[in-house]
């Protein structure tokens, strides 16, 4: 995974991160279940990295989280893929960093 650029489209007065995620998902007509799953994975990602903002993280931290899920969490490939899709949505569509 290539490293992500360090200039996110987030300003100090921007709405809270998960609100931004939900708004983008609703604009694109994602199902409520997908919205819930993605926001849960994003929360878990942030908590895994001790509440660091995703804009301050990049591909290395995403890889660490996904590896942790596979090795320590022993999640299935489809579960790991769902977490990856949630993080891809966050970085590409919300933070506009990918």
Predicted feature descriptions by range:
Residues 1-9, 19-33, 39-98:
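N-terminal core-binding DNA-recognition domain of tyrosine recombinases/integrases
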């Amino acid at each position: 995974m290539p490293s992500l650029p360090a200039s996110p489209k987030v300003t100090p007065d921007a709405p809270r991160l998960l609100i931004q995620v939900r708004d983008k998902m609703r604009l694109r007509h994602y199902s409520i279940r997908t919205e819930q799953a993605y926001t849960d994975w994003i929360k878990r990602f942030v908590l895994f990295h001790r509440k660091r903002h995703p804009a301050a993280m990049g591909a290395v931290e995403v890889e660490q989280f996904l590896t942790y899920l596979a090795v320590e969490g022993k999640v299935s490939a489809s579960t790991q893929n769902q977490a990856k899709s949630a993080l891809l949505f966050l970085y590409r569509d919300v933070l506009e960093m990918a």
